[in-house]
Amino acid sequence: KEEFGIYRIPCYYWITCILKIIKPESFNRCFEKWVRSIMPEKADKLTISLDGKTVRSTGKMQKYESPLHIISAQISELGLTLSQCSTEDKSNEIPTVQKLLKELNIKGTMITADALNCQKETAEIIVKQKADYLFSVKDNHPNLKKNIEDFIQDEAMQNTMQSISKTEKGHGRIEKRTAFVTNETDWLEQKNDWSNLACIGAIHTEFETDKGKSSEWHYYISSKKLTVEELLRHARKEWSVETMHWLLDVHFEEDWCRVEDKNIQKNLNIFRKCAINLIKLYKS
């Protein structure tokens, strides 16, 4: 108070002016340092989940050529957002994720990402920083997916793989997840295209509700030799960042924020994540 001559809480307009002149990149660096300072001392072997979220309220604003899209890095085990990077076009998510990974200290962590970010260059960036990756494989790599699918769908091959099934009940449905893992990857035609590829896995999920039954397959590649339990755990951790995005939408109403200034939108996103991090840390 003495240094700045401020003796009461600034009004809405002053806060808006301050948020406008703060550089989001600088604010994000401070945010990351703060998060690392509040992390438990013995936090190791962590999973960092990457995903993007579009701030939908910016979609119809004249100052935006396309809606603001923000990529977040979430420490899954702690439920803490570690960092973020923005782009004004969702089609630029891949290079934005790669830029974010280069800026972060990810040594010793497992990086999980959706199929969009299952990219050879992204895998190389992760491995160079002495981290591991777990990528979901879908139709954006059709040949890779087909080779993995053909191998895993073969019952004879399934018998040579590690497998485990787990059933959970909740939210009005029964969910059975069966995981398959092989650390023998020499048979895969595309093995040398992916840095340190060491594991191939799949999860078959069966759902049962009052409306009937359904099922789906998910395929994965990883630079780390995983057990089936580790595959199930890491694959589920990928959804932690989606939970954070849900909180931003539902409880913080981010998609309804009509502020047009780009810096303010980006800085408000960081402040909301500060609040979520504090709630996660101090639930009591």
For each feature predicted by the language model, list its residue ranges:
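Polybasic low-complexity intrinsically disordered regions
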Residues: 38-112, 118-131, 138
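A residue-level signal for conserved active-site and pocket-lining positions in enzyme catalytic cores
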Residues: 11, 51, 79, 133, ...
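An anionic, glycine-rich sequence signature occurring as long contiguous blocks
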Residues: 138-236
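Generic secondary-structure signature for well-ordered alpha-helical cores
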Residues: 24, 36, 102, 131, ...
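Active-site- or DNA-interface-adjacent structural scaffold in DNA-acting proteins
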Residues: 4-61
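Basic, amphipathic alpha-helical segments enriched in Lys/Arg and hydrophobic/aromatic residues
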Residues: 234-284
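Short coil/turn segments at secondary-structure boundaries
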Residues: 31-33, 45-47, 161-165, 245-251
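Gly/serine-rich nucleotide phosphate-binding loop at the start of the catalytic core
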Residues: 1
